[in-house]
Amino acid sequence: DVRMIDEKEVKEICPYLSDEVIGASWCPTDGHANPLTTTLGYYKRALEMGVRFYTDAPVKALQKVKGKVRKVILNDGTVFEGETVILVAGYESREIARTIGIDIPMTRLIDECLVTEMQPHMIDVMFGCATADFYGHQTHHGSFVFGSDSGWEVVDEMVDPSTNTADPSKLITNSMTLSASCRAIQSYIPALRDAKIVRSWCGWLDEAFDGV
């Protein structure tokens, strides 16, 4: 369903985008979901289906039985065993997978998010910048939600002088990161120039070395 569109069609779909946008990839079947309500929905439905959840239960290792991953060992020594084990621990999956001899090259990316005050209806689609400066959408009640990587999260302390390479785990936000992200957003959506930010936060994203 994905196709490339020119500036004219971009403006037909999103008239509030600035002239900075001269083309885009467009997928009419794309969408977005509120992560809080979606996660809660999955959780409630899983409970109805008999799923049990264990919180505050850090995983120490996986273990194979007859060549197949069957056991999950917790830090306190508790062992769970099943026919199928699914590893979905984000960046921490790498350390857990290493316990069975598998290494998945991964790194952590810092992502800063912000929510604006309620705005007039402007945009119906999920959108983002190809250079990954920001991505976002307008909610049903009018606020905009954006995620961004401004490039200003780098600090001198994250560079190991012996190798001259950066340690992504030492990325931090600072007084420049949010304002830099806002400037990028304003350049593409000028109508948000005077919008107030209701709240912002940041967290880690996991990324494999192949960019997935």
What label would you give each PLM region?
Residues C14-I22, Q63-R70, E207-G211:
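A short, glycine/Asx- and small/polar-enriched loop/turn
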Residues D1-E7, I104-M106, D194:
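A short alpha-helix-loop-beta-strand transition element characteristic
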Residues D1-E9, I13, I22-L36:
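Active-site-adjacent segment of FAD-dependent monooxygenases/related oxidoreductases
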Residues S25-T84:
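Helical element adjacent to the flavin cofactor pocket in flavoenzyme catalytic cores
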Residues D6, T55-A57, R199:
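Short loop/edge segments at beta-strand edges and connector loops
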Residues D76-D124:
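Central helical "cap/lid" subdomain
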Residues P120-V212:
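Active-site lid/adjacent beta-loop-alpha segment flanking the redox-cofactor pocket in flavoenzymes
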Residues K11, V59-A61, S200-L205:
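Short, solvent-exposed loop/turn elements at beta->coil junctions and helix N-caps
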